[in-house]
From Swiss-Prot:
Annotated InterPro entries: ATPase_NBD (IPR043129), Type_II_PanK (IPR004567)
Any single biological process term in GO: coenzyme A biosynthetic process
GO annotations of cellular component type: cell periphery; clathrin coat; clathrin-coated vesicle; cytoplasm; cytosol; nucleolus; nucleus; recycling endosome
Stretches with biased composition (Basic and acidic residues): 62-83
Functional pathway: Cofactor biosynthesis; coenzyme A biosynthesis; CoA from (R)-pantothenate: step 1/5
Naturally occurring in which organism (per UniProt): Mus musculus
Modified residues (Phosphoserine): S30, S165
Function in brief: Catalyzes the phosphorylation of pantothenate to generate 4'-phosphopantothenate in the first and rate-determining step of coenzyme A (CoA) synthesis. Required for the hepatic CoA increase during the switch from glucose to fatty acid oxidation that occurs in the fasting state.
Positions occupied by motif Nucleolar localization signal: 1-8, 168-185
Protein name per UniProt: Pantothenate kinase 1
Active site (catalytic residues): E313 (proton acceptor)
Length: 548
């Protein structure tokens, strides 16, 4: 719009705004002039084209400069009336103004209050009526059309953008609903990306209402069906069905908690699957712990458009362990120990109540080993650790036996005899070393017999796998026992995926703790060995929602 020229000093020239207001009031005096006025401001009358040079953006400032002339008690400016028209969801109807074509105004209001009429247009016309304008008389044969259309920037905006897809609108509704109830939108995941294995927990809601199921977007249904209807994913992904926690209540929803694992070397396939299933349309952030949360952060962002909320793995380990133990294992205790571990014939698994767990020595046996002294839920310290862990066992077995998987290595170890590989106390002393209480069957030197060519030629791959397993397990047990004595803690809890389907190591650890402490130390184990970090990450997802 071209700027108005300011009046010269001393001039009697009437300001343009005043002339415009006088002209508009004069034209409003008759119904016929009202129609001409509508044409002047560039509004179609009965479907005619707008006149060039009188477009809406030019006329709107005039309307805002005019003073209210209607009979309403509200003396607000046209700006305020326009704002009401834009913002109010239930615009009030202006009362008829005497001498301003009430009949025409009734037609106008009737049209705008009819079903399907835009609310913003009705409010805008009401604003005009309040400021001394009336529309032209409408023909009774033709349906009346709105006389004034707001600029796009003043139009009332719908709750969701008009161009959004139904799936996106549904996702936004789910997020708003979740926000009101202080819980995150589905799906609910927690990840622990370790050096050897990725552990994933997924909460499957079982209390979905008919309305939720109807509004559920297709890719969310696809993810749930894919994860819960399969027990294997590709060549290496496994869902541990026997560990599933059923009828669990988490964050106010009832459902089942699933436990899934796959090798870390297959992480790129998982990220690609997340991209193909458009996971970022459901979530923008995943809660993840473990070293891989840092290593793969950029890949998640670039390939799957996902952000990783990185969490401390030891914090998640403790929080997840305490939570799973508190809910139990489908009506059974999560924790157990081995009774009579020094007697193979009488040794058997027994449940253990861990209601009062503090203090405890927590030995996390993954690719490597970390040992924590835990004094309360939020008070713990890392005492020590060792690089000789589950990764060492599998790596050496692959070198020595040619096996390729953890399961294959354990299967071979179960069939082997480590005494053919290790040098024992009796091989040196001819029997027990009684002065220090060393039995002749105790290992004096791991792999000590492999110095002999004859021994090397007589052993089997299974013997090598068993000796490797015994070596790693004895080393961990020895360090754990010393830490327990130094910290004056009599309960040692062993967790981690090194113990998965590894009954040989568990019984060896139970035997070592009991024998070398003369029954003072008890080795404890948990059913969900290596998944506690992932559970802790899932719990953090709920905490994030509470904080927000």
């Amino acid at each position: 719009m071209r700027g108005r020229r300011a009046p010269r000093p001393g001039s009697t020239e009437v300001p343009a705004a005043a002339r415009d207001a006088d002209t508009l009031r004069a034209r409003a005096a008759s119904p016929v002039r009202g129609a001409q006025l509508a044409e002047d401001v560039g509004t179609p009358t009965g479907g005619g084209e707008e006149r060039r040079g009188h477009q809406l953006p030019t006329a709107a400032p005039r309307l805002r400069e005019s003073k209210p002339q209607g009979g309403s008690e509200d003396r607000g400016t046209a700006d305020r009336d326009l704002q009401r028209g834009c913002q109010s969801r239930s615009p009030r109807t202006a009362p008829p103004v005497p001498g301003m074509g009430d009949r025409g105004a009734q037609h106008e209001r009737a049209a705008l209050q009819s079903p399907g009429a835009p609310e913003g247009a009705a409010a805008a016309v009401n604003g005009l009526l309040h400021n001394g304008f009336h529309p032209s008389a409408a023909s009774s044969r033709d349906p009346p059309a709105p006389r004034f259309q707001l600029p796009s920037e003043l139009q009332p905006q719908p709750l969701f953008a008009q161009h959004d897809s139904p799936a996106k609108k549904c996702r936004l509704r789910r997020r708003m609903d979740s926000g009101r109830k202080n819980r995150p939108p589905f799906p609910w995941f927690g990840m622990d990306i370790g050096g050897t294995l990725v552990k994933l927990v997924y909460f499957e809601p079982k209390d979905i209402t008919a309305e939720e199921e109807q509004e559920e977007v297709e890719n969310l249904k696809s993810i749930r069906k894919y994860l819960t209807s399969n027990t294997a994913y590709g060549k290496t992904g496994i869902r541990d069905v026997h560990l599933e926690l059923k009828n669990l209540t988490m964050c106010g929803r009832k459902g089942n908690l699933h436990f899934i694992r796959f090798p870390t070397c297959a992480m790129h396939l998982f990220i690609q699957m997340g991209s193909e299933k458009n996971f970022s349309s459901l979530h923008t952030t995943l809660c993840a712990t473990g070293g891989g949360a840092f290593k793969f952060e950029e890949d998640f962002r670039m390939i799957a458009d996902l952000q990783l909320h990185k969490l401390d793995e030891l914090d998640c380990l403790i929080q997840g362990l305490l939570y799973v133990d508190s809910v139990g294992f489908n009506g059974k205790p999560e924790c157990y120990y081995f009774e009579n571990p020094t007697n193979p014939e009488l040794c058997q698994k027994k449940p253990y109540c861990l209601d009062n767990p503090y203090p405890m020595l927590l030995v996390n046996m993954g690719s490597g080993v970390s040992i924590l002294a835990v004094y309360s839920k939020d008070n713990y310290k890392r005492v020590t650790g060792t690089s000789l862990g589950g990764g060492t066992f599998l790596g050496l077995c692959c070198l020595l036996t040619g096996c390729e998987t953890f399961e294959e290595a354990l299967d071979m170890a179960a069939k082997g005899d480590s005494t053919n590989v290790d040098k024992l106390v009796k091989d040196i002393y001819g029997g027990d070393y009684e002065r220090f209480g060393l039995q002749g069957s105790a290992v004096a030197s791991s792999f000590g017999n492999m110095m002999s060519k004859e021994k090397r030629e007589s052993i089997s791959k299974e013997d090598l796998a068993r000796a490797t397993l015994v070596t790693i397990t004895n080393n961990i047990g020895s360090i754990a026992r010393m830490c327990a004595l130094n910290e004056n803690i009599d309960r040692v809890v062993f967790v981690g995926n090194f113990l998965r389907i590894n009954m040989v190591s568990m019984k060896l650890l139970a035997y070592a703790m009991d024998f070398w402490s003369k029954g003072q130390l008890k080795a404890l184990f948990l059913e969900h060995e290596g998944y506690f970090g992932a559970v802790g990450a899932l719990l953090e997802l709920f905490k994030m929602t509470d904080t927000q």
